[in-house]
Amino acid sequence: MTAGNVTPKNNQNIIPDIRKWPFAKEIRNFSTPVFPVRHSGNFAVLKGYPDPELLLESAYDTVKRYLRAAGYSESETADYRIETRYAPTEFFESWELDFSAQGCVISAGDTEGIRRGLYEFTDLLSAGNGAFPAAGQKISRRPFLKTRLGRCPFSPVKRKPVNVDELLEETDYYPDALLDTLAHSGVNGIWIVTALRELGQTSLLADDPQRERRIAKLRKTAIKCRKYGIRLYLFMIEPFSVTESDPLFKEHRDMFSADPDINKVKYGWCPASPLTRKYLFELLRSIFTEVPELGGVVNITLGERTTTCLPAVPNRPLTISCRSRCGWSAGEIIRNSLQAMRDGIKAGSPEAELIAWFYLPQAYDPADWVKGISAFMPEGVIPQFNFESGGQKEQLGKTRVGGDYWISYDGPAPRFRAEAEVRRGQPMGAKLQLGCGYELSIVPGIPVPSIVFRKYRELFRLGITHVMQSWYLGNFPNMMTRAMGLASFRDGDSSTEDEDTFLLQLALPDWREDAPAVVRAWKLFDKAYQNFPFSLVFQYYAPQHNMSEWRFHFLPDLEPLAEPWIPTSIPGGDAVGEALGSFTLEEATESFERLIRLWRKGMEELLPLEAKYAGNRERERDFGIAKLLLYQFQGTLNLLHFFELRRRLYVENDKFHLTEMTAIVHDQQRIFRAMIPLLEADSRLGFHGEALTRLFDEHSVRKAIAEADRALETAEEIRNSPLAPVEQVFQRGVWKKIVPEWRTVAPGFKWKHEISNGELSIRLSCPANSEYILMLWFMDAPGCGCQQIDYVQCENGILKYLWNSLLHTQGCIGDTGIRLGCEKPDEETTERIFSWPLKKLPAVDPRLPYLRFNLCLQLGKDFYFAFGKGMGFRLLQGKFSPHEGGCLEIPC
């Protein structure tokens, strides 16, 4: 079933064709800087550091490649020598460079310190335009972040609708050039998606038929990564919940929770059961025994899916679905589950790590039982929390609350800081999203490295020791990746290193004498990006991801917005209110006006350098990223302006606004034409790492230009019609008035609406003993304001208010003014009444007295809608399609 503009999620599986992506080939080429001046002279690399496993050969090769690119020749009798030596150090990966007229001595106490020192030498060589660094310098650094996790930018996500298992693929997702670039950027860990049962062995289950094949690929990949100082980590969500058909559930019921999860489908595991702990221990022990080169496991322990008997949704009261009656607290349940996992990992590989990720992305605060959960970690287990989730930011005179990941918010969020204080002096991890993120997902990196500096300064001050730098998206090696690597190392205990010095050090290897101008541009981009609307709904659904795929609806069709990370979603839509969250359309527009004004100032610093770097592919792509971002911002602003003008067109019922609306469409076409050469030159642009597809490319943008022409034809039809705009909308069937009469919504269930005394009431006639969940949806008629959804449950004949959509937009369950009532409670058929003061519903302009409405009745696993058939579930939006809503006429 397809509703509105989005294809619902189903069992369709998409296999990405890597051959279509030029960047997948380019990423296999080693990067070498362009030196405008060729130097003469000889060099020698003296491998004095003991390296019996030849782990440093890749880093030595990088040094030689850079020196040859600068014009030098390798000679055993060279006057300039780069020598590595062993010297004891207090910290793993720390290093020292000592320069003289005869060369450079790189000393460290371990191979990884030597590796970092060799990479530092190449950066200094690049910063000096190929000249050897000045004699007399002595530079030392040590990392404060022990683990720095990255990822291949296009490796599989292993879930529908892109369900590909990279351990069963022949594709090498980790070519040598990519590993070298990641290592050079400071990455020392890569994570891949796995499932525990598919890899491990346990006496409780038969082996997966493909297990040996997966283990062989895993071992091969781990050994290859190790040659670059990179350890391979297994990402998982374990113990993974099961259905009643699972063989273990059938044979060992006591291993699982008493009741299924909130969706009434899957069961969590009981850590109090010795068999559960045995299951986890044996599976992990077998994996790490067979592949001891692995770095460890990153496990979402709480928050994403049901794992144990604890609620997966962390804002709910603590209700433990228990059969064993163990009496354990939430912290003890988590501790025992993690302890079994840790013991299994350590039994196979004592140096491997277990990172327990508490994925709590919500804008709202978690329940009390979740707070301070890091205090329950078993020894040796590293808790990890989202750095920005639940943060607050002042924008346009209001306090905004943001969930999930944010680049534009420095952080940390209060809940992260609180957990860091609980863990003070003990290892703790941070989940960041710093290449690109859900704010803007379609470039390799957003050029705002000063934000990296400030985030990592806070990590240092809080004593954070591990960082996961990205999710499925934001993994292309780029300047932001290098910024993260640079910020991970310090020259001592100081947490007040100068931001300008950091930015200059980052810019010099690529931009040399032009670094000061580039730093000025970066700082202006940072100031600009601070204006990005701090709203989780906006970052997920607004046009900045793929504005060229949004169509200009001159009629308020209210097609639903798409989830950019789901490749089966049809992009576009025009129900812009779904994307606004806590922002009004006017506020979002003003935010982008401010953003663009400052971004343009940054471009004024950057673009004068463009001609100088013609032919330097990497710098040309840097210019292209900055330009494309400006076009995305401008195109988003055009759409926001367009929707505001469309609102006026129908509120004022005046065709005068069509002139400015058509001018916006023409300007959008101009932007599209400017985007095409950038998209042709860099196939990374438009690519979404979670959807594993380009959200737009040069071909789709050309189609968008043609689609805009067709939209202009609709504008002319509206202009030339003898009917006023509102009359046309009703005549075309875009809007349909709701008559106040009884309507059947499901067998045995009827509803109707009443409006009187400043209140709207929805009456539901239903069997007295029925159990259901009722969702009631409202949006202003033009679709330019945030939607409102109220959720009510009837259980055992008692109505219970669950929550409303303000939870996601405001960070708390706001007051929608709803009142619950009942008539004829003692009869077989009863009437439930749901009432709101009209002033509490989305605002209605007296000149356009209509409110879009729909309701959804959930009976068990079935969903029934008052209008239409709904659609596949969308994150934060539910199953409603705004396109299907009817129009309530509101007396004003």
Regions from the language model: what does each represent?
Residues 800-827:
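Glycine-aromatic-enriched beta-strand/loop faces of beta-sandwich-type recognition domains
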